[in-house]
Structures are given as structure tokens and as C-alpha cells.
Amino acid sequence: MIPKIIHQLWVGPKKPPHDLMKTWRDNHPDWEYMFWNEESIKEHFPNGLYNQKQYDEMPEWNGKCDIARYEILDKFGGFFVDADAVSLRPLDDYLLENDSFSCYENEFLRGQLIACGYFGAQRDCELVRHNIDAIHELSGNTLWEGGVSAWKTVGPVLMSRLVHQY
């Protein structure tokens, strides 16, 4: 069962979109809410993330979020949603009865890619663990040096491949 915890993460120099983030708290008053940033990651992972090396080498902020999101969900479980997403209504409780859930990215822009920016999972979820392990296999920063975007290496492309593989 997926716990009623909403996770949102913001890293980088820009200010978080607090108005958008508030829509999640407003529509889910009975859920625990955890806002994550560089400091809270260090607080909850005092020995660093399992993929700390990949996190530190990732040049894109959204890629850093993807790397951290899997490890946060592995440890706490819950629902991870991008900080720039709007909640229009509460999530349905039946979603929480699964090991994990997500949705597709915009079908017109990215076809059949599974969105990791809207992803719920129970603690110790096998799919989350596969994402963490796949990221750990990325050697150095060779993938990002070639200009390959994070959404192709640690984001939706990786998630989609692993969902279909497992």
C-alpha cells in the first residue's frame, strides 16, 4: 500500500513555484507533505544518496530531481509530483492500493513515455529499486557530456524502459 505522503523537490537557483505546490497541500489536507531541497536531502540521507556520484555529476536540475526522487520514494514511499504541477482535485484512494502508479507523458510530445514526475510507490518498491540500480550503472558523466538530456538518461525514458522490461 502506498502511504499518503506527497513529496515535492526543488533544487537550483530559481525560486520554487509555491502557488502551484500549495494546490497539492490544499487538495490533500489529510496527507503528510514533504518538501525537499538540497538541505533536506542531506538531513534524511546523512551518508549521501546511493547515487550521490551521479547526482553530483548531473548538470541538469531536473535530472538531479529524478535521481533523488527514486531514493526518496524507496525510503519513504508516497506520491512524488513535480513542483511545477498543479493539483486540480484529490488523488483517488484506489491508486494507493497498488505497488506503484504513474501516467503517460504528453502523448503528443513524447509518445508512450511514462512520467516519473507524477509517480507513486510503496516503500521498497521493486520498480523504484530497478530505477535506482539502473542509474547506479551509469558510469561517470559520459552520458551527459555528450549533451544527452536527463529525461533520456534518468527520467521518463529510463522509467518507460524499466516498466516494459520488468
Predicted regions and their residues:
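Small-residue hinge/turn detector
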Residues: 66-78
